């Protein structure tokens, strides 16, 4: 089909993909994407704002459509120009890292480290380090200090505080409660 013979009204009904395919067939060579967009804009007589609105969808359609191929560096061509064996598309394969096997052999260094370990439960070693053993009998807590710091917990503590506020007789009933 020759799109050059179409009227402007018929051209406006064409999709950008159809026009891009026509332009690439006529040129018979690859084209940079911005140049392709300019030629489509000129062919369809679109304004800059109109082409900008449709540009994202057009680029997506070109990637999805099986007739076009991206050759890198934003250069596009028709897939029909290239035999299947000649297409060198980048195929990304996921490589999973190989798991390292745990070594079953024991190193001599491990045994040396175990021999050098210090047992801190041994009283002789504690004395060598200059530390003193402290027993609970040596440290007595003063019970009087705890009474001052103790506050009732939960809602009982809140209620006790409310009762304390009104014990001096200043409390009068609210007339709205009657």
From Swiss-Prot:
Which Pfam families does the annotation name? HARE-HTH (PF05066)
- Among its keywords, does the record have Transferase? yes
Q: Which PROSITE patterns match?
A: HTH_HARE (PS51913)
Domain of life according to the entry: Bacteria
Residue ranges annotated as transmembrane are none
Cite the residue spans of the region called Disordered: 89-122, 141-178
Keywords, sorted A to Z: DNA-directed RNA polymerase, Nucleotidyltransferase, Transcription, Transferase
Q: Which GO terms describe its cellular component?
A: DNA-directed RNA polymerase complex
Gene Ontology annotations of biological process type? DNA-templated transcription; regulation of DNA-templated transcription
Domain HTH HARE-type stretches: 14-81
Output compositional bias ranges, type Acidic residues. Answer: 105-122, 141-150, 161-178
Which GO molecular-function terms appear in the entry?
DNA-directed RNA polymerase activity
Described function: Participates in both the initiation and recycling phases of transcription. In the presence of the delta subunit, RNAP displays an increased specificity of transcription, a decreased affinity for nucleic acids, and an increased efficiency of RNA synthesis because of enhanced recycling.
Q: NCBIfam families, per this entry? A: RNAP_delt_lowGC
User: Subunit structure of this entry?
Assistant: RNAP is composed of a core of 2 alpha, a beta and a beta' subunits. The core is associated with a delta subunit and one of several sigma factors.
Family (UniProt): Belongs to the RpoE family.
Q: What is this protein called?
A: Probable DNA-directed RNA polymerase subunit delta
Q: Which organism is it from?
A: Listeria monocytogenes serotype 4b (strain F2365)
- Report which gene this protein is encoded by: rpoE
């Amino acid at each position: 089909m020759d799109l050059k013979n179409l009227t402007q009204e018929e051209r406006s009904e064409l999709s950008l993909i159809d026009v891009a395919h026509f332009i690439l067939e006529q040129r018979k060579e690859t084209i940079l994407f911005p140049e392709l967009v300019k030629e489509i804009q000129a062919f369809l007589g679109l304004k800059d704002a109109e082409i900008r609105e449709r540009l994202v969808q057009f680029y997506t359609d070109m990637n999805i459509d099986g007739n076009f191929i991206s050759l890198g560096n934003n250069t596009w061509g028709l897939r029909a120009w290239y035999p299947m064996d000649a297409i060198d598309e980048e195929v990304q394969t996921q490589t999973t890292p190989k798991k390292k096997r745990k070594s079953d052999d024991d190193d001599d260094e491990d045994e040396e480290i175990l021999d050098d370990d210090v047992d801190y439960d041994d009283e002789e070693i504690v004395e060598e380090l200059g530390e003193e053993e402290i027993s609970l009998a040596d440290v007595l807590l003063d019970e009087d200090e705890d009474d001052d710091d103790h506050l009732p917990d939960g809602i009982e503590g809140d209620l006790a505080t409310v009762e304390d506020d009104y014990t001096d007789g200043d409390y009068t009933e609210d007339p709205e409660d009657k």
